[in-house]
From Swiss-Prot:
It is an enzyme of class 4 (lyase). Its cofactor is NAD(+). The keyword NAD applies. Its EC number is 4.3.1.12. This is Ornithine cyclodeaminase. The gene is ocd. Belongs to the ornithine cyclodeaminase/mu-crystallin family. Transmembrane segments: none annotated. Keywords: Arginine metabolism, Lyase, NAD. Catalyzes the conversion of L-ornithine into L-proline with release of ammonia. Pathway: Amino-acid biosynthesis; L-proline biosynthesis; L-proline from L-ornithine: step 1/1. L-ornithine binds at residues 53, 77, 120, 235, 301. It catalyses: L-ornithine = L-proline + NH4(+).
Length: 359
């Protein structure tokens, strides 16, 4: 980590610095390397403190805290989800995060995580698909072409080799935006007029819609044998994308069951409905894809360990880049037990500066 001579200083990665870091590394390389960190932390799943995120729900959306620790480092993310924000020119999702040293409790990094969350969500989806999707899958349908769609496409290209996209959104302008942004990225892209058209011939179906509703984006008759479904949009109570019959036909894989049963597609199913945990697939404890006709479903809601992985990755990539600010965030008195004395000394400093003659 960047060593700081003053204990009050915490490295801060702004949105501008994050964009520069991503572009310096390269988007696909960033996604591939980040996926490596995500997978590494799933492999040591049992080392982590795990809890469902702490959520404050309203009719407009949700604000959440997502904490975890591996005993050496502690990380958390603040994130919101407000689907109607785009009507007011605002982002649906915004986020920031902190990485801290467990030994001292001191923060080591403060960073924007709106862009970073989009990257880690896509990287996690691709990690899951690497273990669950049909072998040599090359064609992906993306239903919902808003803020997350390009990241999903590029992650699946970088990690699985997906090079054919079939896009659909209720808003044709969103699809046009996605196509425009992915020009020159090496995709064969088809803009589709319906969900049914988009999923035709797809090896992987990604659903990434934003409305906070129990929607039915995919119905049972749209999903054929052998498909992998990457269900990203359902991520809070009352927000789903898939018809329940699809769930009952699929082998379901989740990040953390206590959270996914509240927020994911499986909130539609009984609490004791059997699901598989992704970490067990990644570590080889259980099988992922077993045969060519199996329907696999990654019920993605996003979990704190993935943000922890992203924070670790950014911390490591920042070395020697200068792509951060030194933020005066922590009180650092000369005598740790004399915090009030620090305030008094600063008062004297301000008084002396105010009495200095003008130059």
């Amino acid at each position: 980590m960047m060593t700081q001579p003053n204990l009050n200083i915490v490295p801060f990665v702004s949105v501008d610095h994050m964009m520069k870091l991503v572009l310096r590394v390269g988007v696909e390389t960033f996604l591939k390397e980040l996926a490596g960190y995500v997978e590494e932390d799933f492999r040591r799943w049992q080392n982590f403190d795990k809890t469902p995120r702490v959520a404050s729900h309203s009719k407009e959306g949700v604000i959440e805290l997502m904490p975890t620790s591996d005993g050496t480092l502690y990380g958390f993310k603040y994130v919101n989800g407000h689907p109607k924000n785009t009507r007011d020119g605002l982002q649906t999702v915004t986020a920031f995060g902190v990485l801290a040293d467990v030994g001292s409790g001191y923060p080591m990094l403060l960073t924007e995580m709106t862009i970073l969350t989009a990257l880690r969500t896509a990287a996690t989806s691709a990690v899951a698909a690497k273990h669950l999707a049909p072998k040599n899958a090359r064609t992906m349908a993306i239903i919902g072409n808003s803020a997350q769609s390009e990241f999903q496409a590029l992650a699946f290209k970088a990690i699985l080799g997906v090079d054919k996209l079939r896009l659909y959104d209720l808003d044709p302008q969103a699809t046009a935006k996605c196509i425009r942004n992915l020009q020159g990225a090496g995709f064969n892209i088809v803009a589709c007029k319906s969900v049914e058209e988009a999923v035709e011939g797809a090896d992987i179906i990604t659903t990434v819609t934003a409305d906070k509703a129990n929607a039915t984006i995919l119905t049972d008759n749209m999903v054929g044998a052998g498909v992998h479904i990457n269900a990203v949009g359902g991520d809070c109570p009352g927000k789903t994308e898939l018809h329940g019959d699809i769930l009952r036909r699929s082998d379901i894989f989740v990040e953390y069951p206590p959270q996914t049963r509240i927020e994911g597609e499986i909130q539609q199913l009984p609490e004791d409905y059997p699901v598989n945990e992704l970490w067990e697939v990644i570590t080889g404890r259980i099988a992922g894809r077993k045969d060519a006709r199996q329907i696999t479903l990654f019920d993605s809601v996003g979990f704190a360990t993935e943000d922890f992985s992203a924070l670790r990755y950014v911390r490591d990539k920042l070395k020697d880049t200068g792509l951060y600010e030194q933020l005066d965030l922590l009180a650092d008195p000369d005598e740790p037990r004399d915090l009030y004395g620090m305030l008094l000394r600063h008062e004297k400093l301000l008084q002396s500066e105010s009495t200095k003659p003008a130059a």
